Amino acid sequence: MRLEIKDLHVHYGKIEAIKGVSVVVNEGEIVTLIGANGAGKTTMLKTISGLRPVTSGQILFNGEDISKMPAHKRADLGLAQAPEGRGIFVGMSVLENLEMGKYNRKDRKKEMAEDLEKVYHLFPRLKERAFQAGGTLSGGEQQMLAIGRALMSRPKVLLLDEPSMGLAPLMIQNIFNIITEINKTGVTILLVEQNAQQALQRAHRAYVLEVGHVVKEAKAQDLLNDPAVRAAYLGTGAH
């Protein structure tokens, strides 16, 4: 299942936020987009998932142009997003939040129960707190819930927007371990992340965005060792 973005342009009113970006995510990969605030990373994910309109360019999902397709149709094809800010329903229980993730599913209760157990296996804390309101969870637990809800739709490609935002270092490590585990089950991942160190350590390939442009693309390990990337995004110079 290949996701390909070709020469994408996206506007907010008269302001061009994405300026001719091309990105490829091959089946089975973790690909990360890194860059400073305002680089266009979140806009990219919103546009891919159908929450922002395309000005020009193409979004191809397994060869099919989905650029004009409504968000729910894209979800039916196998795109799922865990958004920035998590977007959980604070007044609903953990279980109810997870059940919201399967709104596009038409399979039997047995299969849905199996998927719920898979989510609980990845995130045991969610099982412990199944009947707690989402709003009572810690930031890390809410992030687990957002990812778990996205997984309930059985995605082929998972879009993750800033999963480490606002989390303590130990929880960040935990979340990235789980992202790696999800990928090993066969889910392709496009990851937007300001924690460039963790993102580049986990990804197969990476793109660097600056003010709506791709300025670098390479294997993640190569970017991790790139002196310019280290100085700009990892807080270190060349060694």
Protein language model features and the residues they cover:
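Glycine-rich phosphate-binding loops of nucleotide-dependent enzymes
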Residues: 1-239
